[in-house]
UniProtKB/Swiss-Prot annotation:
Organism expressing this protein natively: Prochlorococcus marinus (strain NATL2A)
GO molecular function: ATP binding; ATP hydrolysis activity; ATP-dependent DNA damage sensor activity; damaged DNA binding; single-stranded DNA binding
Principal place of residence: cytoplasm
Designated name of the protein: Protein RecA
Keyword DNA-binding: yes
Gene from which this protein is expressed: recA
Subcellular location field: Cytoplasm
Amino acid sequence: MSNEGKPLQLTESKKIDAKSGEKEKALSLVVGQIERNFGKGSIMRLGDASKMRVETISTGALTLDLALGGGYPKGRVIEVYGPESSGKTTLTLHAIAEIQRNGGVAAFVDAEHALDPVYAASLGVDVENLLVSQPDTGEMALEIVDQLIRSAAVDLVVVDSVAALTPRSEIEGEMGDHSVGAQARLMSQAMRKITGNIGKSGCTVIFLNQLRLKIGITYGNPETTTGGNALKFYASVRLDIRRIQTLKRGTEEYGIRAKVKVAKNKVAPPFRIAEFDILFGKGISTLGCLLDLADETNVVTRKGAWYSYEGDNIGQGRDNTITWLEQNPESKEIIEKLVKEKLTEGSEVSANSMRPLASAARQASSRPNLSQVSANG
């Protein structure tokens, strides 16, 4: 009985092999035809792609880098939105400074005509080599963005802001004229046009956006962003930034505490939250971010108001501890290295808690060592 079934099985397997061979041949023919018509690289197997992992740009805040899965993704569209004076422009200026430090070229399309070069320079931006455009119309701004992207010579383009991209028809019209949906149509057309070029050139484009309130909304969130829905769909990352606290020394205000929620992320888990300090005239407090994560991962321990490192008290209160980190750069480097090591240990966490990587690292540090367990056993 079993011997009679073997020839039938062999015949079936030969048929399957022949069929798969024909399909593979047809596939290679059609791929070759597409490449001849549209150029090399117009279609490929994903495993053959030269860059599988998405490269990132640091945001300037270690906590936000972790929430984003490394930083801003290169070659993608990013939207940063929030209320006034929440830190939107500061975030993008730090990204520009990071790009320039690594030898890249950045451009700032200042549709609001509000860029402060002195403040930008204080954040580390090389204002001498920063490309700046102050366009008259929304069409002009987006055409400039498209040409910069297609040049493949620019690594980062910042548009400040979508709300200020006024269509030509509105500028040439009179006050009070209704131009319903003109800005949304402009943004939709621009997104369709520039998205393909962004992927090819590897240029990152950050759009800053403002908030508006929907009229007549009783339930749910009445807030929305300007420029229609196109940017929401085309953006790989959307960041919602809010001011949650004003930092004071006595009666003097010296900064704000910002909270960023990753509202959308196509390259890492979304809905993570990061907090950091923005100091007036100085930008994001990198040492403040480091201290927060060192506390989360138990590299630096806190008892009451005192912070201690390796059993020694290093500062009473957060401000004094940050000052100690400034005055001891060697210890700061060691603490930063230890924090990153612990975060790497706990990087497989899947929960979207406030600081998931840090909380996982804390669990990893409290877990007993297997060698110690076996020795004690």
